[in-house]
Amino acid sequence: DGPQLGVVCDIDDTVMVTHMPRALVASWNAFVKQSFARQAVPGMAALLNRVQETNPGAPVIYLSTGAWNVVPTLRNFFERHNFPRGPMLMTDWGPTNTGWFRSGLEHKRTQLRRLMIDLPEVKWLLIGDDGQFDRIIYGDLAHDHGDKVEAIAIRKLTSSEHVLAGGNHVALAEPQVRSLKQSGALVVSGRDGFTLARKLPASLVGPQP
């Protein structure tokens, strides 16, 4: 048998959208608990379920810069929209010793490095979006740990989602593009989970319907 497959999946703007400025998402998540205020990205639940059906036992780990206190709300949301169950790696909300806001970039990098160390036998499908840091984080990880990354799937945000996410339409800086290309990992992108599933190999998602 080859290495086990695992999935790391971002939450905000990847599997779920709130149509709120990213700077307000933390406070929104902290005080507004209703899962109906969030919308599922089409096809993302189906994509994750196909990965698990094709690779029995593959864990799905949800990685987010959201606060721990919204985990019950997210679990309700995932159950209502038929997302596979999986652990959530969240962060604490509030000021730190170095500033008023915690670094989402560093949180994700730290958690991913920990997964590489704690689960050396797993190769990862990394799923995120192009709104802020995911392409940079995943590209750097694949460049440094190419043998641990099976593929990278990036959801392409709409123009309005880019604005709310605090991102923009400017291409990645050249070193970031080079890191992504030189990583050796398969990189696919699309507007939703259905498009990503069509572009990923059958070894990950099974035969195309």
PLM-predicted stretches and their roles:
Residues 1-105, 166-168:
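Alpha-helical substrate-recognition element adjacent to the catalytic core
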Residues 66-209:
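C-terminal cap/substrate-recognition subdomain and adjoining C-terminal extension
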